[in-house]
Every structure is written in structure tokens, then in C-alpha cells.
Amino acid sequence: MVLLKEPVQPLPRSSLLYNNASNSSSRIKETRKVKLLYNPLTKRQILNNFEILATLGNGQYGKVKLARDLGTGALVAIKILNRFEKRSGYSLQLKVENPRVNQEIEVMKRCHHENVVELYEILNDPESTKVYLVLEYCSRGPVKWCPENKMEIKAVGPSILTFQQSRKVVLDVVSGLEYLHSQGITHRDIKPSNLLISSNGTVKISDFGVAMSTATGSTNIQSSHEQLLKSRALGTPAFFAPELCSTEKEYSCSSAIDIWSLGVTIYCLLFGKLPFNANSGLELFDSIINKPLEFPSYEEMLNGATSGITMEEYTDAKDLLKKLLQKDPDKRIKLADIKVHPFMCHYGKSDAASVSTNLETFHELKVSPPSSCKRVELVSLPVNSSFASLDSVYMENFDHNNLRTGADRNSTYSPSIYDANTLSPSAYHNIGSRESSYSSFSSFTSSTAFASQISIQDAPAIGDQQCLIGESGSSLRVNSCEFPQYTTMSPVGEYPFESTEASLSSTLTPVGNVPQRIKAHLVEGKSNSKDDLRIEADASLVFEASDAQRTRRRMSLYKL
């Protein structure tokens, strides 16, 4: 059982959090250089000092990844934002800055409150098409109010939460909203999925992708005509306030729209369904503007998680919702009045600290501990590689006209080494490379350009022993180091060489101005007192590796 802790009491306006909000940004680290690495052993990507572990969510305004700080071991959430807007009809070379990215960053830099998700670091590399926000990780995920097997838009009730559990959620959200509004921030997208629960049970407001703010701290934000059009197109329609759905009156984006969406959220938590629903957007907007608010009967409420409520509690809940879902924004209840409403303060006060939730309701994602590997060799990736697949690499927005020839490429390549026990770095040699478009049978599906690099990677040398490279004609000869093993490793698997020939033809498939298949294999033979290892690729790229000491080596295929 997970205890939901007591909600945080709002700070007085004399607090430093109110008067010195600008100081919050000084706690946030801003990094202007992004380095992307790939771990071929764990098949995970590493963004600067953060190992990407899993996907937490894919929203309209960005993806969110679970990551581990390699320095501290702490878990964080990384939100990935597109720096440029995607506009149909425009050339790929015409890049339009996404104004919501800077807006979200500026809003979050001003926030520092226990009921608001914390921003730790901003990774903003001008060379990258992405902007990364390193955020506080709330391990119990978003607030759930309907069964997992039900779509929220089709939920018909009852709720899986009790009235007491819902009250605890609402009190934390009200505390967070009070802080935001005091800073002149209107969230504009309050809903259960944007309310995250930390490991200690605190509810935190997240996702400021459509939030609006003013530098003066005013809670009434007048929008320009362009902002008006955008604000009506962004957010979650089922949680829109009536003033967002209507085009008849002059629109002002005020904190009252957060009060409305809070009312819709509370309705979902208490009754397990949306207060206004329809089959189309126009019907939904008409329902929000004109349809009177309706409630399930008290008899219906006696089923499920709400079976223990009294008629008085049910009546007070309806009264609060009527004041929250008031169609006239000027008549809507204020946050301060919500906290003292009978529904919020007359029930369950004596045992508030004992309120708990089932693990099935607020489950915690289990994360495996860091890898125990003592030595991991990391491959540097292009800064604009994608996190779309954690076991593949592909480049976005790559201009085919900018492809370089082999002569233009830098012949030296040194992957980064992450060594937990300060072992000697491995010897790495770039045997050869070619640039074209590649696609893997398993996960490479992008039609943009790739660089394929075939490399021989030797095990660590002992003492001062070095690996020597010799060149003969069109072939490269490598003298091996220590540690006997025949293994080929790539992002798509490992291939041990037990026999005299092992086919690698399934590793890469070319797309573009190259032969339609790559045929690569290893041939083992004997010449005098040494073993010759021969690696072939599509009959035109031949590498010979000589092993004079009859030791073994591993070969890696990396797709960059």
C-alpha cells in the first residue's frame, strides 16, 4: 500500500518562492552541448550523462523517456521536444522554430514547488533538432481513474478511486495551481494524465507544453490574435472551458480555464467518466457550451469504490462541481474557496494520513539496477539520432546532397569509453567505411541517409603491447592483441565464428546507390604458422586480418 502524504499547504506570499521566483532558474543546469552515445552491449543510448532506459509516454507535444543519471544513479524523466515545427507543404530545408519550446522552458524555469514537477537540466544544443528537458521522475505515474482496459474517452463509471483518495489528489493539485497562478502561469491542460504521483505519494502537476505566462505575474493573460488561434487548437478538448470552445466573444486566457479543467478532472475522479462527451469535436464543443451538468444518481454511486459515501457527502460533491463547472468564467469558484468547501474539509479529516491506494491503481515502474559490466565501449552517434528505437540508430533531417565521399571522411574514429573500474581502454581501429542509405531487417526503417562502418575491435592489450596495423594494396592487415574469442557484435546481434565460414549477409541491407545486398563473411585459413582472418563485404570491400600469435579477436559491425 502506498501512502498519499498530507498535501502541502500553500506558502504565504511573503515566501521567497513567491517573491524571488526568478531565482528558481539559477538552480537549473543549462547545457549547450549534446553528446549521444550507443552501448552495443546493453543496446541502450546515452544522452550526455543519462542512460536511456525506457519510454514513459508519447504525447502530442513531445516524447518522455525514463533515464538513469550515470553519475548518481538517480532516475529522471527526459522530455524530448522538437526544436522546429513540422509544417506540411514546406521544404525540409526550411526550418521554423517552434515557439512553444522556449515558452515551456521559460515557464518551468520559474517553477519551484512541491506540487509541481521539477526541472533539473536543459540540454539545448544549437546543432541538434531536439531540445531535452531533464525532469523529476514520478515513479507511480499519472493518476488513474478508470480501469486499465477502458479507454478514458469511453469510460462510463464508476471511478476506481474513493472520494477520500480523490480529495487527497485535489488538495495537492489546488496547492500547485495556487503557486502557478501566483507566478502568472496558466497551465491550460489540467487533466488526470498530467497529474503525476511521486514515490512518496505527492501529486505533482506536469506537462507545461501549452502553458502561458507573463513576466509581471498577472493571472489574466491577454492573447494576441495569433496566440488566440493557437490556444484554441492546443490542449485536450474534453477539458476545454466553454470560453475556449466559443468564437462569439472576445477571448482572454485567464486562470479561470484552469478552474474549469480542474472541475472536469474532479468529476472524472469521483464518477469515473467525463462530464461532457460526444462523437465529434463540434458536438463536444456544443455540449460544453450549452448542455447542463448532470450527475450519476446516489444509488449508482453506491457501487464500486464509492460505496461508502453518505448522501451528505454526495450532495456536497455535486455542489462543488457545479461551482467549478460554471459556464460563466467570472462566476467560477476561486482556488481559495475550493479548499474551504465542505466537500474538501468536512470528511475524513481525522484519518487523512492513513489514506492509501492499491498498487494496481498507482503502480510503480520497476527498473533493473545498473549493469554490472566492468567495461563498456560506447559508440559515438550523430547528434540528431532518434530515440524511436532503443536498439537502432538512424539520422533525421539528413540532406542527401551533403553526403561526403570516402576521401572526405575523417579516417580516425575513437569511441568513448565508459569504464567503471578504470580498466585500460581497448584498442580500436577504423578498418574502412562507406556511406549510403542502410536499413536493417529488424528495426532500420528510415528512408534517410546512414553511414555504415565496419570495424575490427581488439580486446585490451596487456602491458605496453600494442596492436599494429599494416596496409597492403586495397586490404588492411591488423595484428591482433590478447583475449581469445571469435565474436562479431553489432546492434542487431552477436555472431560467434565456430566454423570456417560464417555468413553476415543478414546484418545489413543497403538502400540506395549500392548493390542490393551486402554479403559479408569470415573465412579462416592457415598460412605457415599464422591464422589469416578474411572479412568480405559485397565482393568489393575486402579486409584481411592477420593473427600471428594464434590469438583470437572479436569484430564489431556498427551502423552509424
Swiss-Prot record:
Per the UniProt entry, the Enzyme Commission number(s) are 2.7.11.1
Q: Where is the Protein kinase domain?
A: 50-344
Please tell me whether the keyword S-adenosyl-L-methionine is annotated for this protein. Answer: no
Stored PROSITE patterns: PROTEIN_KINASE_ATP (PS00107), PROTEIN_KINASE_DOM (PS50011), PROTEIN_KINASE_ST (PS00108)
Tell me how the protein is altered or processed after translation.
Autophosphorylated.
Q: Which UniProt keywords apply?
A: ATP-binding, Kinase, Nucleotide-binding, Phosphoprotein, Serine/threonine-protein kinase, Stress response, Transferase
Q: Which reaction does it catalyse?
A: L-seryl-[protein] + ATP = O-phospho-L-seryl-[protein] + ADP + H(+); L-threonyl-[protein] + ATP = O-phospho-L-threonyl-[protein] + ADP + H(+)
**Highest taxon of source:** Eukaryota
Residues reported to bind ATP = L56, G57, N58, G59, Q60, Y61, G62, K63, V64, K79
| Active-site residues from the entry | D189 (proton acceptor)
Main EC class the enzyme belongs to: transferase
Q: Which Pfam families match?
A: Pkinase
| Molecular function via GO | ATP binding; protein serine kinase activity; protein serine/threonine kinase activity
| Protein function | One of the three SNF1 protein kinases (with SAK1 and ELM1) which are required for growth on nonfermentable carbon sources and nonpreferred sugars and for response to environmental stress. Activates SNF1 by phosphorylation of its activation-loop 'Thr-210'. Required for the regulation by SNF1 of the transcription of a large set of genes, the modification the activity of metabolic enzymes, and the control of various nutrient-responsive cellular developmental processes. Also phosphorylates GAL83, MIG1 and SIP2.
What the record says about its domains?
The C-terminus (residues 351 to 560) is required for efficient SNF1 pathway signaling.
Q: What family is this protein classified in?
A: Belongs to the protein kinase superfamily. Ser/Thr protein kinase family.
Q: What is this protein called?
A: Serine/threonine-protein kinase TOS3
